[in-house]
UniProtKB/Swiss-Prot annotation:
Membrane topology according to the record: Single-pass type I membrane protein
Domain Expansin-like EG45: 26-139
Role description: May serve to lubricate the movement of the cellulose microfibrils during cell growth and wall extension and/or may serve to maintain the fluid state of the slug cell wall.
Keyword set includes Disulfide bond: yes
Family, similarity comment: Belongs to the expansin family. Expansin A subfamily.
Protein name: Expansin-like protein 8
Sequence ranges on the Extracellular membrane side: 22-464
Length: 485
C-alpha cells in the first residue's frame, strides 16, 4: 500500500508538471507581420528553448536582437483567431527578415492556419502581437558547464542555459565566495557566460537573475553544480497580472493611415485591379503638382482594387477620404469592400480634382475585410486619377500600437508566501538590455546596503535536483500502476 501511495504521488507530480498554468498578459497590443513555414530549423539559434508543446517561431534579426527574446512567448492575433508561440530562432535572409521597422514572425503552417487562411495568402500584414507569460507551472531549469578543457570546474569560466522560464531573461549576475562585487554574465541566444574578470570563482556562489518583466531571483549554489544535466532551480518567474491589461483583448493591428500617398503603404498592393487599358501608380499628374498618384484608364466595369494580404479589421475605421478626378463627369462611380459594388458614391466625380469623404459604415463593411475597390460602374470607359487615399480612425482606435519598441512591462510583483523573501538588488549602473541589447563585455556591479531597492526578488538554494524527462516519469508511473492494480 505504501508503494502504491508513493507511485500515486509520483504520478500526480508528473501530471502537475505537464499542466500549463494560465498565461499572463505582459504588454500592450503591438503591430507586426506573420508568414508561415513548412519546415523549422532542427537546431534553432536559441539554445535555451524547451517549448514543451508550445509552438516555436522565428523573428527577424532586429527583433531577435542577439537573442534577448529567446524563450519569450507571444500571443498572435489574425483574422481567424489567436495562437501562442515561443521565440526560438532568427531569420536573416530576405527583406522581411532584414527590415527593422516591425516584428516579423515566422510560424509553422499549422499555427498560421489557426489565425489566417494559408490557401488565400502567404502573409498577415495586420498581425497583432502581445507579450505573454509561457504558462509553465514547473520550475526554471538550468544546465551548467565549465570550460571545454575541464567542464566540471568553474574557477575561470561558467556557462548556464536556463529553460522552462515563464518569461525571457534579460540579465544574470554572479557573486562568488569573498567577492565584494557582483559581475555580469554575457548573454547570447539564451546562453549566459561568465569569464574570470578579477576573481576566481569559489563556492558558495550566488546568481542574481532578472526577467524581461523586471522580476528578480537570487539562486544560491552551495557547491559546484552538476554539469551537463538539467537541474531544478526551485523557482519560477510569476509575473503579476497588470490590471490595465486584464481586459485588454487584442484584435488585429490597426491599419496604416494611408493606402496611397506618393506610393502604396506597407502591405497594400494594387495588382488585382481589373478591366483597364492603362494603369500606373507613378503618375506625376497630381493635385499638388508634386509627388505621384494613380492613373488608370478603366474599361466599362473596370476597377482599381487595393488588397492587403492577411485581411484587415474595420472596427476602428471611421471614414475613407481620397482625392479624385476623371476624364469626364460621372455619377456612376462606386467604392466598395469585398467583391460586390453596392451603390454609387455621392457626390459626382468630375474632371477637376475633388476630395471625397465617405463613412466606412456606408460602404456596408464586414468586421474583417481583404480589399477595397474604386469601380467604374458603367459600360463606358473612363480615365481616373486617385491620390491621398486615407482612413480616419474612430475615437477609441489604439493609435499607439508599438512595432519595434521594447514593450515589455516593468512588472514588479509582490513577494508571495512560500516563494522566498525579498532580496537586495545590486547597483545596476550598466549592462542588461538597453536599446541595442546585451553588452558583449562583463560589467561589475556594486552591492551596497545604502542602495537597496524594493525590487521584487525571491531566494532559491541549490539542492541540485536532477530532472528526469517529465514524459518518461509519467509513462513509467502509468506502467507500474497498471501492473499493481
Amino acid at each position: 500500500m505504501r508503494i502504491s501511495i508513493i507511485l500515486l504521488s509520483l504520478l500526480f507530480l508528473s501530471l502537475h508538471s505537464l499542466i500549463k498554468a494560465d498565461i499572463t498578459k505582459l504588454s500592450v497590443c503591438g503591430s507586426a507581420r506573420a508568414v508561415p513555414t513548412a519546415t523549422q530549423n532542427p537546431k534553432p539559434t536559441c539554445v535555451n528553448v524547451n517549448s514543451q508543446g508550445i509552438p516555436t517561431a522565428g523573428l527577424n534579426s532586429a527583433a531577435f536582437d542577439n537573442g534577448v527574446r529567446c524563450g519569450q512567448c507571444y500571443e498572435l492575433t489574425g483574422p481567424l483567431g489567436k495562437t501562442v508561440v515561443m521565440v526560438a530562432d532568427v531569420c536573416d535572409a530576405g527583406s522581411a527578415c532584414t527590415q527593422s521597422d516591425l516584428f516579423n514572425f515566422i510560424i509553422p503552417n499549422e499555427e498560421f492556419d489557426k489565425i489566417g487562411n494559408r490557401s488565400d495568402y502567404g502573409n498577415i500584414f495586420s498581425l497583432c502581437y502581445q507579450i505573454v507569460s509561457c504558462g509553465y507551472s514547473g520550475n526554471v531549469q538550468g544546465v551548467f558547464t565549465g570550460p571545454s578543457s575541464s567542464p566540471n570546474t568553474f574557477t575561470y569560466f561558467l556557462s548556464v542555459v536556463f529553460s522552462n522560464n515563464n518569461v525571457a531573461i534579460k540579465k544574470v549576475l554572479i557573486k562568488g565566495l569573498s567577492w565584494p562585487l557582483y559581475e555580469s554574465l554575457t548573454g547570447q541566444n539564451g546562453n549566459w557566460k561568465w569569464n574570470k574578470n578579477s576573481y576566481e570563482l569559489q563556492f558558495p556562489a550566488t546568481l542574481y537573475i532578472t526577467s524581461n518583466t523586471g522580476e528578480t531571483i537570487t539562486y544560491k549554489m552551495n557547491s559546484r553544480p552538476i554539469t551537463n544535466q538539467p537541474i531544478d532551480l526551485d523557482f519560477q518567474f510569476n509575473p503579476k497580472a497588470i490590471s490595465s491589461l486584464e481586459n485588454n483583448e487584442c484584435s488585429m493591428a490597426l491599419l496604416p493611415q494611408y493606402i496611397y500617398q506618393d506610393g502604396l503603404s506597407y502591405g497594400w498592393v494594387d495588382s488585382q485591379s481589373f478591366n483597364y487599358a492603362k494603369f500606373t501608380d507613378k503618375s506625376s499628374d497630381t493635385k499638388s503638382g508634386s509627388g505621384t498618384c494613380i492613373n488608370a484608364q478603366l474599361d466599362g466595369h473596370g476597377g482599381v482594387k487595393f488588397t492587403r494580404e492577411g485581411d484587415f479589421q474595420t472596427s476602428y475605421l471611421d471614414k475613407l477620404s481620397f482625392d479624385i478626378k476623371t476624364s469626364a463627369d460621372s455619377s456612376s462611380f462606386a467604392v466598395y469592400f469585398g467583391d460586390v459594388a453596392t451603390k454609387n458614391i455621392d457626390p459626382l466625380v468630375a474632371s477637376t480634382w475633388t476630395t471625397v469623404e465617405l463613412s466606412v459604415k456606408s460602404l456596408t463593411n464586414n468586421t474583417v475585410e481583404g480589399s477595397i475597390t474604386f469601380f467604374n460602374n458603367q459600360a463606358d470607359p473612363i480615365n481616373i486619377w486617385l491620390d491621398n487615399i486615407k482612413w480616419t480612425y474612430t475615437d477609441d482606435a489604439p493609435l499607439d500600437q508599438p512595432t519595434m519598441d521594447l514593450i515589455e512591462v516593468n512588472n514588479k510583483p509582490s513577494t508571495t508566501s512560500g516563494t522566498g523573501t525579498t532580496s537586495s538588488k545590486p547597483s545596476s549602473s550598466s549592462g542588461g538590455v538597453s536599446g541595442g541589447g546585451i553588452g558583449s563585455e562583463s560589467s561589475i556591479y556594486g552591492l551596497s546596503s545604502e542602495n537597496q531597492e524594493n525590487q521584487s526578488g525571491h531566494h532559491a538554494s541549490s539542492n541540485t535536483n536532477i530532472l528526469l524527462p517529465t514524459t518518461f516519469v509519467f509513462f513509467i508511473s502509468i506502467t507500474i500502476l497498471s501492473l499493481l492494480f
